[in-house]
Amino acid sequence: MASKKMREEATCSICLHLMTNAVSISCGHSYCHVCIVSFFENLNRMTPGLKTFSCPQCRAPFTMASLRPNKQLGNLIEVIKEMDQEMSCEEHGEKLHLFCEDEGQLICWLCDRGAQHKGHATALVEEACQGYKEKLQQAVTKLRQLEEECMNLKVFTAEQITKWNEKIEFQKQKIQSDFKTLQRFLHEEEKSYLWKLEKEKEQTLRRLRDNEANLEQKNHELQSHILELENKCQGSAQKLLQDVKDTLSRSWAVKLEQPEALSLDLHTVCNVSELYFDVKKMLRRHQVSVTLDPETAHYELILSEDRRQVIRGCPQENLDNSSRRFSALPCILGYEGFTSGKHYFEVDVGEGTGWDLGVCMENVQRDTVMPQTPQSGFWAIRRCKEGYVALTSPLTSIHLTEKPLVVGIFLDFEAGVVSFYNMTTGSHIFTFPKASFSDTLRPYFQVYLYSPLFLPPPDE
């Protein structure tokens, strides 16, 4: 039911009913449109030509032109009418003061006594309202929990979308990088095979042309002998018999040596389909032998005699304090340096739980802890507790479906490319953005506890 104050605001002070087509005058008071117009007309009849009128409530002056529809008040009146209609029993016209629990309906006192609600549990509206308000609040609490859960799921789904897009982008870059690497390799292989084919062509052609030249020379000799014999046959008897035995002897002594037998079978044969799908073969064409440089080893690193294996252990004594030695981190460099060309080497990481692998500039800092990023002269990847990352700035997460037991590292010095491969599966791991190398590059390793590294020889 509408409050007393609401009803007072919606009641016209002229007709004392809820306003119809409420309008306001300049002082702010409102009236029914019909009532205030009738008020004007009555005053005009008493005082013809009157232009200014006094508000029936506050006596403030106003004019007819100041009338304005009061939509807000009109809306309030409609609400009050609906409330009045809802709060009255449609059957009996009585106020709905009771609530039937069995039917879940508002009823009046006559309904309560009728046959329809006989024996039903009823309560005063105020009492029933309090109980149901608590239940509604409980329902609101539950729905808010569901709303919060829904929002959390929405956030989770948005994160999944982001992660999925990142995964797709990573895979896209990986595919593009793999094909670029493959295209470079195929281009180099094409040039290599064409060069070999051209070389084989020239070698065989040179021998064939030698045969051709020898046969040409022999043909001239035969033609000379034939001409000599034909001239004798066509001459006089005395001329024919002159030195005839010597001429015959020389003629019968002429032999035709067979040219060098040459096979026309091609030795330079390229199976493009095999090249295309054999990544391991592709990389190992550039494989170099890498050993460890003991003069760069951190004092906790222990090398094998052949300098192909390193493990982290107790600090080594009696080591010199060379500026070439890593003193801040347990790192070591490969003995070999690269200043041009393509190079590939492998590192057997086994079941190790941590390692850094890659290449670095010859002049990197070795006595201070610093980020091992390309900006500092390092191009390396890492395995740690969190998984696999490329040492970029910021770090780049690497998602691998299979754990590499052997990691292949490929360097194209002129192209500025450093790539990493899982040689357990032959799949690409990561390629750094193109760089410009200005210094000698050397293989780089950081050794973790219980994670030895082994550099297999190229023929293994």
Swiss-Prot record:
Principal location listed in the UniProt entry: cytoplasm
Domain (B30.2/SPRY) ranges: 270-460
One GO CC term, this protein: cytoplasm
Cited SMART domains: BBOX, PRY, RING, SPRY
EC numbers, comma separated: 2.3.2.27
Name of a matching Pfam family: zf-RING_UBOX
Subcellular location: Cytoplasm
Catalyzed reaction equations: S-ubiquitinyl-[E2 ubiquitin-conjugating enzyme]-L-cysteine + [acceptor protein]-L-lysine = [E2 ubiquitin-conjugating enzyme]-L-cysteine + N(6)-ubiquitinyl-[acceptor protein]-L-lysine
Start and end residues, zinc fingers (B box-type): 84-125
Pathway membership: Protein modification; protein ubiquitination; Protein modification; protein sumoylation
Binding site for Zn(2+): 89, 92, 111, 117
ZnF RING-type: positions: 12-59
Domain of life: Eukaryota
Sorted UniProt keywords: Cytoplasm, Immunity, Innate immunity, Metal-binding, Phosphoprotein, Transferase, Ubl conjugation pathway, Zinc, Zinc-finger
Disulphide-bridged cysteine pairs: none
GO molecular function: transcription coactivator activity; ubiquitin protein ligase activity; zinc ion binding
Residues where Phosphoserine is found: 66
Complex and partners: Interacts (via B30.2/SPRY domain) with TAB2 and TAB3.
Its job: E3 ubiquitin-protein and E3 SUMO-protein ligase that acts as a regulator of innate immunity. Acts as a negative regulator of type I interferon IFN-beta production by catalyzing 'Lys-48'-linked polyubiquitination of AZI2/NAP1, leading to its degradation. Mediates 'Lys-48'-linked polyubiquitination and proteasomal degradation of the critical TLR adapter TICAM1, inhibiting TLR3-mediated type I interferon signaling.
Protein name: E3 ubiquitin-protein ligase TRIM38
Annotated organism of origin: Bos taurus
